[in-house]
């Protein structure tokens, strides 16, 4: 599958397990921004780039656990007009060290398949299944990394929404 041309940047996706989809485009279009933004599971870098395009004075850090995805994001960002605004890290959120930066906004299109069959493609399994990042871990990490008024913007299927919201409430993260 080829790349996608957006208004001010192009996304190549040949190295990523998960390709550009409606979920990521929607999240990048409506997520709240801030001065410091973190994109968890950046994949192609699409959401980080959309946030940079929308919030020109923001600094954005984008992370991905999958090496090829982090490389693809880095390549896409380097070819964009927003390369000075975004830094990409190949790491898991559990291992990520933000150097004491707290984020005003975190965006995430997380893996959401729980207890389901994984596919033969390891990259796709990492991107789609909660084995490497449970909702509990994601919420816990976000709470530690957000400022006191910070916002987590996330997109989930309706089938997992209730379990995510319950876990968020149990950990003290509230829906606005």
Where in the sequence are the language-model features?
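Mobile active-site "lid"/loop adjacent to the S-adenosyl-L-methionine
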Residues: 110-137
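Conserved Class I SAM-dependent methyltransferase catalytic core
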Residues: 16, 133-176
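Short loop/edge segments at beta-strand edges and connector loops
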Residues: 13, 89-91, 156
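Conserved SAM/SAH cofactor-binding pocket of Class I
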Residues: 26-100, 105-108, 114-119
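Hydrophobic alpha-helix-in-membranes signature
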Residues: 109-110, 156
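Class I SAM-dependent transferase core
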Residues: 1-33
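A generic structural signal for alpha->beta connector loops
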Residues: 8, 57-59, 83-85, 149, ...
């Amino acid at each position: 599958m080829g790349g996608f041309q957006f208004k001010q940047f192009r996304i190549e996706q040949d190295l990523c397990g998960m390709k550009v989809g409606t979920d990521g485009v929607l999240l990048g279009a409506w997520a709240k921004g801030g001065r410091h933004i973190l994109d968890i599971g950046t994949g192609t870098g699409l959401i980080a780039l959309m946030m940079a395009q929308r919030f020109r004075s923001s600094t954005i850090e984008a992370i991905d656990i999958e090496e090829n995805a982090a490389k693809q994001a880095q390549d896409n960002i380097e070819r964009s007009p927003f390369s000075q605004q975004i830094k990409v890290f190949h790491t898991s959120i559990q291992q990520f060290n933000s150097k004491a930066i707290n984020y005003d906004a975190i965006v995430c299109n997380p893996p959401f398949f729980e207890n389901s069959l994984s596919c033969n493609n390891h990259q796709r399994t990492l991107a789609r299944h909660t084995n490497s990042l449970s909702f509990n871990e994601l919420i816990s990490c976000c709470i530690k990394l957000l400022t006191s008024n910070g916002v987590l913007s996330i997109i989930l299927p309706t089938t997992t929404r209730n379990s995510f919201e319950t876990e968020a409430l149990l950990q003290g993260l509230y829906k606005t």
